[in-house]
Amino acid sequence: MRIGNGYDVHRLAPGQKLVLGGVEIPFECGLIGWSDADVLTHAIMDSLLGAAALGDIGLYFPPGDPKFKGISSLKLLEQVTALLAEKGFGIINVDSVIVAEEPKLRGHVDTMRKHLAKAMGIDPGRVGIKASTSEQLGFVGREEGMAAWAVALVDEK
């Protein structure tokens, strides 16, 4: 078995869509990025790639590549999952935390878990998501952005 960690952060801006865990969440601001800027899914992908010692998402989906402009991060997660399978790895579980002051995310967590689990081909019971704040400290506390951390456990088949 192997463990990997992932982290991502994106800026918030008015007029952008907010997508977390593949779920569009109603909010006056969204995250800025080359893809859909899904900070949670990006952290999960990095944790999976790290567990398999396969680099990070920037290696496979570089910012600036027109193929990935505005793409759903769930589609990228499907590709990461396929890469792991090709290299002989299976996903046991992932656990994650999103750090944001607003909006409140508790009501969206189950839907996020289902979307992420489907993209990874695992049961939603193997996907942990927690939402937290930074107690109004730092860039997250000033509502300038959001961050996410993830841990993945994979096994070699």
UniProtKB/Swiss-Prot annotation:
Record carries keyword Lyase: yes
Enzyme class: lyase
Pathway of action: Isoprenoid biosynthesis; isopentenyl diphosphate biosynthesis via DXP pathway; isopentenyl diphosphate from 1-deoxy-D-xylulose 5-phosphate: step 4/6
Pfam families in the record: YgbB (PF02542)
Disulphide bonds in the chain: none
Protein keywords: Isoprene biosynthesis, Lyase, Metal-binding
Site (Transition state stabilizer): T133
Family annotation (InterPro entries): MECDP_synthase (IPR003526), MECDP_synthase_CS (IPR020555), MECDP_synthase_sf (IPR036571)
Cofactor(s) this protein cannot do without: a divalent metal cation
Leader sequence segment: none
A GO molecular function held by the record: 2-C-methyl-D-erythritol 2,4-cyclodiphosphate synthase activity
EC code: 4.6.1.12
Family to which this protein belongs: Belongs to the IspF family.
Role played: Involved in the biosynthesis of isopentenyl diphosphate (IPP) and dimethylallyl diphosphate (DMAPP), two major building blocks of isoprenoid compounds. Catalyzes the conversion of 4-diphosphocytidyl-2-C-methyl-D-erythritol 2-phosphate (CDP-ME2P) to 2-C-methyl-D-erythritol 2,4-cyclodiphosphate (ME-CPP) with a corresponding release of cytidine 5-monophosphate (CMP).
Name of the molecule in the record: 2-C-methyl-D-erythritol 2,4-cyclodiphosphate synthase
Species assigned in the record: Dehalococcoides mccartyi (strain ATCC BAA-2266 / KCTC 15142 / 195)
